[in-house]
């Protein structure tokens, strides 16, 4: 059914410019429309295995690129990446593939924007997958306990290519920062700390009401209805089985579970502090 654009273009072309020239111009415009719609359809109907494979490869490619942004990949960086692979229980061929993708991302000529554009196309209409992808990259950026200015700039590029505005990204960053206090996905070595506009800061031990509100993306002054709505939305977006069905690699299912546990812990803390069920 990829001829409707050409047919419509032909009709409109003849209507506005009678003759061969109008017909040719209409067909040309219609052909371009058909190609654009076809690309969107391919993204929307990409099979699950294709999305999972691309998600897996792109995750480690971009992670390698992000790590290299600081200037030089150190042994600590490699160890942190290996810890993530351990959390995913990657062994054998899967681990080798992840390591190869990580090395590809470190190359100076790695096409970051093009890679992200292809990833976004295949994830068409699945923002929850894009959200998980960005959360994993934030883990990589904060793995050593701080956010390098160059890493921040790369993260802005990642967000931009994935259709996330600067304001949305800053909200992601605040939510991620709150999650670090719950001992979840925010740090591979259990660092405690926070990030503000001025940089990395030491945070008090143990999560606070403010931390929990950051995780859910709400304010401490919000009522129970707004908080419950935010909680349910986040839990729905991070449901491991649903994410795998949409294209999350099975290897990353454990990370989705940990994020869901973090959201639950934050919600429980808010309920205790604010006194509602």
Curated annotation (Swiss-Prot):
Give the record's membrane topology.
Answer: Single-pass type III membrane protein
Q: Which residues lie on this side of the membrane: Cytoplasmic?
A: 32-277
State its location(s): Cell inner membrane
Q: What is its main location?
A: membrane
Q: Which GO terms describe its cellular component?
A: plasma membrane
Which Gene3D superfamilies does the annotation name?
Answer: DnaJ domain, TerB-like
* SMART domains registered for this protein in UniProt: DnaJ (SM00271)
Annotated TM spans: 7-31
Task: Select a single GO molecular function from the record's annotations and give it.
Answer: protein-folding chaperone binding
- Check the record and name the Pfam families matching this protein: DnaJ, TerB
Q: What is known of its domains?
A: The transmembrane domain is a dimerization domain.
Q: What does this protein do?
A: Regulatory DnaK co-chaperone. Direct interaction between DnaK and DjlA is needed for the induction of the wcaABCDE operon, involved in the synthesis of a colanic acid polysaccharide capsule, possibly through activation of the RcsB/RcsC phosphotransfer signaling pathway. The colanic acid capsule may help the bacterium survive conditions outside the host.
Q: Give the protein name, as stated in the record.
A: Co-chaperone protein DjlA
* Natural source organism: Yersinia pseudotuberculosis serotype I (strain IP32953)
């Amino acid at each position: 059914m990829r001829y409707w654009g050409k047919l419509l273009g032909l009709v409109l072309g003849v209507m506005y410019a009678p003759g061969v020239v109008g017909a040719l111009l209409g067909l040309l415009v219609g052909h371009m429309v058909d190609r654009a719609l076809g690309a969107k359809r391919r993204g929307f109907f990409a099979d699950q295995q294709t999305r999972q494979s691309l998600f897996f490869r792109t995750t480690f490619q971009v992670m390698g690129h992000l790590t290299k942004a600081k200037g030089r990949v150190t042994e600590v960086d490699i160890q942190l990446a290996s810890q993530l692979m351990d959390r995913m229980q990657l062994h054998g061929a899967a681990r080798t593939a992840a390591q190869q993708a990580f090395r590809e991302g470190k190359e100076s000529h790695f096409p970051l924007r093009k890679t992200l554009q292809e990833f976004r196309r295949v994830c068409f209409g699945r923002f929850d997958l894009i959200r998980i992808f960005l959360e994993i990259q934030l883990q990589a950026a904060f793995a050593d306990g701080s956010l390098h200015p160059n890493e921040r700039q790369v993260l802005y590029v990642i967000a931009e290519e994935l259709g996330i505005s600067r304001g949305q990204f800053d909200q992601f960053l605040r939510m991620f920062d709150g999650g670090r206090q719950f001992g979840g996905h925010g740090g591979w070595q259990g660092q405690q700390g926070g990030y503000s506009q001025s940089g990395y800061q030491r945070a008090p031990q143990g999560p606070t009401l403010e931390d929990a509100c950051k995780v859910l993306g709400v304010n401490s002054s919000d009522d129970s209805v707004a908080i419950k709505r935010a909680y349910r939305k986040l839990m729905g977006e991070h449901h491991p089985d649903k994410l795998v069905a949409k294209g999350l690699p099975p290897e990353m299912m454990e990370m989705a579970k940990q994020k869901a546990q973090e959201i639950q812990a934050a919600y429980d803390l808010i309920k205790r502090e604010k006194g509602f069920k």
